[in-house]
């Protein structure tokens, strides 16, 4: 179930504050955050966020196509190593 339209998008207050400060100053420094649940709003466009994936911070550059999604969608938490090749010759 999606979030109600009347509630509006959820953005952590500390994250919005950091973006507003950078927009006022005109800087585009990397913003480190653990808030994967925050929705990307139009004022995030052009900023780079270091989103925590549980182990490290993954850099995410926000573009126009990302608006409406959550920051955590662009920082995968699991690394896929690939399937093990089925070696039938070694079993004999």
Curated annotation (Swiss-Prot):
SUPFAM superfamilies: Ribosomal protein S19. GO terms for biological process: ribosomal small subunit assembly; translation. GO terms for molecular function: rRNA binding; structural constituent of ribosome. The keyword Ribonucleoprotein applies. It comes from the Bacteria. Pfam families: Ribosomal_S19. One of its GO terms (cellular component) is small ribosomal subunit. Keywords: Ribonucleoprotein, Ribosomal protein, RNA-binding, rRNA-binding. Coiled coil: none annotated. The keyword Ribosomal protein applies. Protein S19 forms a complex with S13 that binds strongly to the 16S ribosomal RNA. Belongs to the universal ribosomal protein uS19 family. This is Small ribosomal subunit protein uS19. The lineage of its organism: Bacteria, Bacillati, Actinomycetota, Actinomycetes, Bifidobacteriales. The gene is rpsS.
């Amino acid at each position: 179930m999606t979030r109600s339209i009347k509630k509006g998008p959820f953005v952590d207050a500390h994250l919005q504050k950091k973006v507003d400060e950078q927009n006022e100053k005109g800087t585009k420094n990397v913003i480190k955050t653990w808030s994967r649940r925050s929705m990307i709003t139009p004022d995030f466009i052009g900023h780079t966020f270091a989103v925590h994936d549980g182990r490290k911070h993954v850099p995410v550059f926000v573009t126009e196509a990302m608006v409406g999604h959550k920051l955590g969608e662009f920082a995968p938490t699991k690394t896929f190593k690939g399937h093990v090749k089925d070696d039938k010759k070694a079993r004999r």
